């Protein structure tokens, strides 16, 4: 009992934790990388990055060399999200291996190890170095003895003074392993001071050693001796796959030895390179196959020396198979396997929640396989598989969830009533969700269900009943039980009579445009409602999207009709009626065949193209259940208005033909063709257009139309025509042949016009008199030859320029700026005028400065405007045509009128009597250079209008009758032969409607334009004829 209570407590706790299906354990997004921190860095801060996802959000802890860091107790440590920040890092306190541990309620995972290393470069000892003295020809080694440093450094040597560096060659070599300078054979030029320079690869810091003097001894020259290998690679060289391997080998000797390399029992890798006068063998991107024994040989005339060493290539572990998150029911068995490759072969360790996992009674670890038998809630957590060899460790993580719950049923299984028909098969689902898997039992009514051949409990717990009958009706209950509890669902089964259906008619043949009604009747259990569904080719008919072609009609509860109106070809197919009840669904189908015009023929192929014909072939399209009776060929060109029917051979293309010849095409024209089929129902859609083709070239057959003459210059024959359309040019190189001859002669002159767009030709001959008749015809040609000529027409050469001057030239001054010029012209036979030109100039000017105005045709007068007033002008008139100008007439003289008076009528007075307005004003006296006053004009217009009524008078008074009700504007101006003078200021006069106005109602008004004062005494004023 206590055991059950404990399990129940764990179960309830876990259910609370797992209530949110989206929760999951930590997953690393970013793990820390190795960091090299320069001790002289200005930032004074190290950041080790770590970030993980999880729900709930994970928390973070950090380990250094396997011990947890207490971030809270040391101010130098801080956490930003998951990253560890170390302020003022110290090599003694902080260098080492770091790991990030991230945790949420589902467990913990441990990151890879990241190494924090400090970069620095110490100083050389300041102690003076002893001189090295050797004999000439002897070999020597100068020691660098570098200071303390981290990480790697680069060596170079300075000779005598910076920056004179020692150049490496076959005689001198600087080892990047020891930093020493090796001179295989010392020469007198080598005497001097040598300084070792080292550079940190991370900080780029440099330091110089104290100088080492090199001197020569006085006891003679060193004799020849065999090579002695002073620099060689280790006996065993290890390298990671993909890195670059550098192996050094250098020897002292006299003469200077030569270095050679080889791979023992194999060939040197093709990618291998020899550096520094062959003293370094470099193998980039080293692979496992590059491993083996390598030999360095130093040789000179005195002998040779050999060194051999082994290159071993290792690989870091790499995953082949990782872990996957797993969910198990309580009591099941877990088997996880992770696989990795590497050289040496990796070994495996397992962690649970960041802590090593050890074998127990239920837990077994064999190499890369973890097995846990009979899992329970305590096994849930985050697991990690570690694959490691001596060169590295990799981590794979996964979450194990243990499901433990009492049985529950999904809502979709809670069907209270199941209605079926006799003979049906029914499955009553019973699939409770539970962990561990529950035991299932069934009851019918109050009794345990007994299985039979018809009634069986399926392996997953559901109940299946075959060939149902009335005896199967009743109440069924399913109960699921496991250690955590139980649950039950109940369903009632009702067995009905099966539904039957009949759809009529069974097969229909109709023609496009006809209509039909399909009837669907159902025989069904009277206790069930029925619903009718209509389909076409298995798809539901959407009555709202069929443009009124379909209508569903339900006349009775057990029947439905489908009306199909104005049938189209697309409506052909299998029509189905489906009857649905709560117990079953049945359907029936009928086929509708629709006859209609043929479908479009297949691809049109164009073959055997000539200049006027093309042979077409096609494949027949659908006949839509009415045999094709004939075909029609259509063509389209850039010159046609859409598609046009073309003539064919044969004239009538019967429905069983699949080729024909299009004839009477135009040569050298691009055509597309299509085919249209017809049957007794009608004509169908056309085929797709064929590829565009061009007919062959041919001699042109269409001459130009409307050949005629045009006006031109003297001695010219101008021949014009309508250009031939490109449609009828029949080929490239199209042009015109212009033929002409004087009327009555025999020989033709021919001229070629090469432009296909040309519409005229001008022939010039100084000996041709004006209006000489010519016979003319225009032919055509192209690259294939000459075509026909147009019919012969007779045209005349250009007429001559006019020879006679106009006579009876008269000029009349009309105003200050207008002169009317009139003339007569003598008729000529060879120089008919097209118009006249009037030249005019002022009396003080030369005729060459004359301004010119032309008439538009054979007119006999012209009004000159825009002239200066009171000015004497000279005028001439001459005729002109296309050939040129005729002689001018004798010049005539005429003066424009003086300017009209510039002074407006003054002291304008008026009396209004109803609609009558009596006006009076003082006379206008013109200046000496102005025209005499001949009379006056009174201008009357309604306010807002532009057209004025003009009243002329010889007197200085007038009576104006206002025509209608409104406000009127009145102005007065003088009239002279020079034109109208300046108008007086406007007078606004209202017009009143009504009866007669007495004298007492009369009003005298005065408007003065002068500066003098005028006083009027009104006693009685009656309008008279004199005012």
Curated annotation (Swiss-Prot):
GO terms for biological process: cell adhesion. A lipid is attached at residue 999 (GPI-anchor amidated serine). Its main location: membrane. Residues 600-698, 703-800, 805-899, 901-994 form the Fibronectin type-III domain. Residues 32-117, 123-209, 227-307, 317-401, 407-494, 498-593 form the Ig-like C2-type domain. SUPFAM superfamilies: Fibronectin type III (SSF49265), Immunoglobulin (SSF48726). It comes from the Eukaryota. PROSITE patterns: FN3, IG_LIKE. The keyword Nucleotidyltransferase does not apply. InterPro entries: FN3_dom, FN3_sf, Ig-like_dom, Ig-like_dom_sf, Ig-like_fold, Ig_I-set, Ig_sub, Ig_sub2. GO terms for cellular component: neuron projection; plasma membrane; side of membrane. The keyword Nucleus does not apply. SMART domains: FN3, IG, IGc2. It is a lipid-anchor; GPI-anchor. Expressed by subpopulations of Purkinje cells in the cerebellum. Also expressed by one type of Purkinje cell afferents, the climbing fibers. Glycans are attached at residues 65, 123, 324, 376, 467, 706, 743, 858, 929. Residues 1-19 form the signal peptide. Residues 1000-1027 form a propeptide. Disulfide bonds join 50-100, 144-196, 249-296, 338-385, 430-478, 520-577. Contactins mediate cell surface interactions during nervous system development. May contribute to the formation of somatotopic maps of cerebellar afferents during the development of the nervous system. Interacts with INgCAM/L1 and the tenascin-R TNP protein. Does not interacts with NrCAM. Belongs to the immunoglobulin superfamily. Contactin family. This is Contactin-5. It comes from Gallus gallus. The lineage of its organism: Eukaryota, Metazoa, Chordata, Craniata, Vertebrata.
């Amino acid at each position: 009992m206590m055991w059950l209570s404990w399990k129940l407590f764990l179960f309830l706790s876990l259910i609370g934790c797992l209530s949110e299906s989206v929760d999951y354990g930590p997953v690393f997004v970013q793990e820390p990388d190795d960091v090299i921190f320069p001790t002289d860095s200005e930032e004074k801060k190290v950041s080790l990055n770590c970030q993980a996802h999880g729900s709930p959000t994970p928390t973070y802890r950090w380990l250094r060399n396997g011990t947890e860091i207490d971030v809270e107790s040391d101010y130098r440590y801080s956490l930003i999200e998951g990253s560890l920040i170390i302020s003022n890092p110290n090599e003694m306190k902080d260098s080492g291996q770091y790991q990030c541990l991230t945790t949420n309620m589902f467990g913990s995972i441990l990151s890879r190890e990241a190494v924090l290393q400090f970069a620095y470069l110490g100083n050389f000892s300041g102690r003076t170095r002893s001189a090295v003295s050797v004999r000439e020809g002897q070999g020597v080694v100068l020691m660098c003895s570098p200071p303390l440093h981290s990480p790697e450094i680069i060596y170079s040597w300075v000779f005598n003074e910076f920056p004179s560096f020692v150049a490496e060659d076959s005689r001198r070599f600087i080892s990047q392993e020891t930093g020493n300078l090796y001179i295989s054979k010392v020469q007198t030029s080598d005497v001097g001071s040598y300084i070792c320079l080292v550079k940190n690869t991370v900080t780029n810091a440099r330091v110089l050693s104290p100088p080492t003097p090199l001197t020569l001894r006085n006891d003679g020259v060193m004799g020849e001796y065999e090579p002695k290998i002073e620099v060689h690679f280790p006996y065993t060289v290890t390298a990671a796959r993909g890195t670059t391997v550098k192996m050094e080998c250098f020897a002292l000797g006299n003469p200077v030895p030569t270095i050679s390399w080889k791979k023992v029992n194999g060939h040197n890798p093709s990618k291998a390179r020899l550096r520094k006068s062959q003293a370094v063998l470099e193998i980039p991107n080293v692979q496992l196959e590059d491993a083996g024994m390598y030999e360095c040989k130093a040789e000179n005339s005195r002998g040779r020396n050999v060194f051999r060493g082994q290159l071993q290539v290792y690989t870091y572990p790499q995953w082949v198979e990782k872990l996957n998150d797993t969910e198990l029911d309580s009591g099941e068995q877990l088997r996880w396997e992770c696989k990795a490759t590497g050289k040496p072969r990796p070994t495996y360790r397992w962690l649970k929640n960041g802590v090593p996992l050890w074998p127990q009674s239920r837990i077994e670890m064999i190499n890369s396989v973890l097995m846990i038998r009979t899992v329970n809630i305590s096994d849930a957590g985050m697991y990690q598989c570690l694959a490691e060899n001596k060169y590295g460790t990799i981590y794979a993580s996964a979450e194990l969830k243990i499901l433990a719950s009492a049985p529950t049923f999904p809502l979709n299984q809670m069907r209270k009533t199941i209605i079926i028909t006799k003979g049906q098969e029914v499955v009553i689902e019973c699939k409770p969700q539970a962990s561990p898997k529950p035991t299932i039992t069934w009851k019918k009514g109050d009794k345990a269900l007994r299985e039979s051949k018809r009634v069986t409990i399926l392996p997953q717990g559901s109940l299946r009943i075959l060939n149902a009958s009335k005896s199967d009706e009743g109440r069924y209950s399913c109960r699921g039980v496991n250690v955590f509890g139980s649950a039950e669902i109940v369903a009632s089964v009702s067995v009905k009579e099966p539904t039957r259906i009949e759809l009529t008619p069974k097969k229909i043949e109709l023609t496009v445009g006809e209509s039909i009604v399909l009837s669907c009747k159902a025989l069904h259990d009277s206790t069930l409602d029925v619903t009718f569904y209509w389909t076409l080719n298995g798809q539901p008919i959407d009555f709202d999207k069929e443009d009124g072609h379909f209508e569903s009609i339900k006349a009775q509860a057990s029947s439905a009709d489908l009306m199909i109106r104005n049938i189209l070809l697309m409506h052909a197919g299998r029509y189905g009626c489906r009857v649905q009840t709560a117990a079953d669904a049945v359907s029936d189908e009928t086929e509708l065949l629709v006859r209609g015009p043929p479908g479009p023929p297949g691809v049109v192929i164009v073959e055997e193209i000539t200049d006027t014909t093309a042979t077409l072939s096609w494949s027949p399209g659908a006949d839509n259940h009415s045999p094709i009776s004939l075909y029609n060929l259509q063509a389209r060109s850039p010159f046609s208005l859409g598609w046009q029917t073309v003539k064919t051979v044969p004239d009538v293309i019967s429905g069983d033909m699949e080729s024909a010849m299009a004839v009477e095409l135009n040569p050298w024209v691009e055509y597309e063709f299509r085919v249209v089929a017809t049957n007794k129902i009608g004509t169908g859609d056309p085929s797709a257009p064929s590829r565009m083709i061009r007919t062959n070239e041919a001699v042109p057959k269409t001459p130009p139309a409307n050949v005629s003459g045009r006006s031109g210059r003297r001695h010219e024959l101008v021949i014009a025509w309508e250009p031939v359309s490109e449609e009828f040019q029949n080929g490239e190189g199209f042009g015109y042949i212009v033929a002409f001859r004087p009327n009555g002669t025999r020989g033709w002159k021919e001229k070629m016009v090469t432009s296909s767009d040309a519409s005229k030709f001008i022939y010039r001959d100084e000996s041709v008199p004006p209006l000489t008749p010519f016979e003319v015809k225009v032919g055509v040609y192209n690259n294939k030859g000459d075509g026909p000529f147009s019919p012969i027409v007779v045209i005349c050469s250009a007429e001559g320029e006019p020879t006679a001057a106009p006579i009876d030239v008269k000029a009349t001054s009309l105003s200050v700026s207008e002169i009317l010029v009139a003339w007569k012209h003598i008729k000529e036979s060879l120089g008919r005028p097209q118009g006249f030109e009037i030249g005019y100039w002022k009396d003080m000017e030369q005729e060459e400065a004359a301004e010119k105005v032309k008439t538009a045709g054979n007119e006999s007068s012209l009004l000159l405007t825009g002239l200066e007033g009171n000015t004497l002008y000279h005028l001439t008139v001459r005729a002109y045509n296309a050939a040129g100008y005729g002689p001018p007439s004798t010049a005539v003289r005429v003066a424009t009128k003086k300017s009209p008076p510039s002074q407006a009528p003054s002291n304008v007075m008026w009396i209004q009597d109803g609609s009558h307005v009596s006006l009076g004003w003082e006379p206008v006296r013109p200046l000496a250079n102005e025209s005499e006053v001949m009379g006056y004009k009174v201008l009357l217009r309604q306010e807002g209008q532009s057209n004025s009524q003009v009243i002329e008078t010889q007197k200085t008074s007038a009576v104006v009758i206002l025509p209608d009700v409104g406000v009127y504007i009145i102005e007065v101006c003088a009239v002279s032969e020079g034109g109208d003078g300046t108008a007086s200021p406007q007078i606004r006069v209202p017009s009143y409607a009504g009866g007669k106005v007495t004298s007492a109602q009369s009003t005298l008004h005065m408007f003065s334009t002068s500066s003098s004062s005028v006083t009027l005494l009104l006693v009685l004023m009656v309008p008279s004829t004199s005012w």
